[in-house]
């Protein structure tokens, strides 16, 4: 495909402008690029071809490749939420071009973007909708003698197959792999062996050896992917050949620094990457295919053990150390666990592998001092999953499966030795106590993670260790000033909080609260987390620290927590804020208006400061959660409103994209609970709501809709002059597949609130608007929303009026809606209020003489009502319910932060029953129907018999 010269120039200019430092120029160009992508036919092909042109600007090429990748990510898979799906012809063209463009890519950056794109396409299309790609890759793999090109081919193959890692073993994955394994393994093994021969032949050729070993690395990654779901029969039959190749690289020796040394302090060397991949493979086979692999296991254990004891403590070796220790841990729990059964072997594992890899390194201490956020992530947030410490702890857990008593005895000796060494010189040997705490944790924990409450082993006395080694450290009795130890102790309490008796909790709090005033980021953050977790512990559903206890000690808890934000590094400490959220929730309704006002003033001031430069989105969310929760209790008080309004005004005036969804929610709470005499304060907001610019951001839609609903309900008939503007908003929303349900929320509120005379002139337009949307893009969601709205309309204004309104648009439309849309959907409606609405509307139709005049329709309605009130589903409805499972919201990762609506979980709008006078829809039906039947006995009784309904 050849691009017109003007298209090339247009795109080049746009992409160059989109890379400019000037914000206005950059944003305008980005907007035009997005418009081009959405509105130009074949835009995905144009982008792909454009980035492959040799003459274009390098920055434009890169941005074009990124735009192509993002378009694939957002629009390749069809679905209700995809507003601009890619035509199937364009998809086929992309798939026919992509591999060649990857191989001919001008630079590594664009090549990487294209490989990522291919991987995403492969997730949905390979192999069923893309059968040509694998034979083409195999052909290239077998015929290509150029090692750099072969490396690219293997990289592509790896990206295509990695989707099977972690995939469930089901019919689809097995069917796909059956096809793949029918054509790939033989040429794959041939290439693996051939590459091994080439490696041996080039032991003195550094440049060629590096290229070959890069290929080996991809080959190993491919092997892992092909083995992840099920053991391929070919692999099982040829395990001897494969394991010979694995041993080749585990035993590989060379002096070439480009192979054995890393390019930086954190990146593993090429050889270590290969050996890590092998450890991951043999771990997988030991874990899942242990019977088939057991005869090959012993030599791997020996060689991996040997490599592990020879590997330095450098950070760059951590992935290998983790993978190798994990492999040994898997062996310890496998059918081959007797490899470790001798006391001497267990002793060596504990003393030579576990304890040394538990020990803090200088790099860990530097991380604590220089990058406390990253240290915390590794230590308590689970991102330490591939560290030496984590691997050592997992190895201990694995060994305990068969050798718990022996391992506890062996490591208890190490723990005592470490504590003795610490006590002999606490200043010099404090790392020993850190190791001891970690070892006790490794021995004591039976389940749970590093940041969660854990079940503990009965063979380890957690409470004794807490009293002898943890509590004194926190209380200051040990007279050491090592912040890492204090952090360890706080984490220990957090992990074993369930094992510490309830009567200890008040004293623990007295030791933990002072840590909130420690300027060390880790310490006051861990203290916040510790308090949060202690507050969460319940016995028989009852919190150990009751709401009454918290209320009594509210000032002593909240003031130090709020004080955390005064520290330079903790102005946005989300863990402290999360703890405050929990306390505010626990004490909801128990805090006086005076304290509420003081807290609101504090948190509103924090948000106003944050609004100047929002950066920590989680912190900001928690802060708004606190304000929203506090606001609920006293939202009708003018003094409270006066505190909140300056924040709302500032956010609206500065057009703060991140905070506006929150502020509209706060406004909604104020309006929903406003006393009539104070409503004038909020009426100036209405013109803002009706301004098109207010609806410029999707993120604001849900909160704006809630706010508009609040005004409609509060104003009642006074809102009628604004109906045209309100319906203009609903028309905009209803045409958006992601926001159509919000249009119906507005329409339902209008119908529930206003009498028919206010709506009369708009009714035809409302139904035409809805039906136009359904005709253009019919989805289950929009039909369900319409079904609920239609039911509310009938209940409020009557069945006859509804029929007249719809027939005024088209005479046959009433029956068409009921038979083709409404009836097939009603039984698939979920939610107690929604089901009640459906049942009431069915009752009203069944008991309507106009409906009775159409016997076939009446029979369908009575059968449907029978199913609704009995809880049954028709066959069609069950099928529709299964189909609805396909409509899954996909949260896409964005390039950079894009504000999205974030619901304040603890200030949600409560679902309100629009028809509270009817408490039981079944009883309502029975009583209403009996009256109707008695008046129409001659007509109803035969129809009931025909419908096979007994009432």
UniProtKB/Swiss-Prot annotation:
GO CC, any one term: cytosol
Importin N-terminal domain mapped to chain residues: 29-104
Keywords: Cytoplasm, Nucleus, Protein transport, Transport
Predominant subcellular localization, coarse grouping: cytoplasm
Protein's name in the database: Exportin-2
Subcellular location: Cytoplasm; Nucleus
SMART domains reported for this sequence: IBN_N
One annotated GO biological process: protein import into nucleus
UniProt function note: Export receptor for importin alpha. Mediates importin-alpha re-export from the nucleus to the cytoplasm after import substrates have been released into the nucleoplasm.
Family: Belongs to the XPO2/CSE1 family.
Gene: xpo2
GO molecular function, one term: nuclear export signal receptor activity
Database matches in InterPro entries: ARM-like, ARM-type_fold, Importin-beta_N, XPO2_C, XPO2_central
UniProt-listed PROSITE patterns: IMPORTIN_B_NT
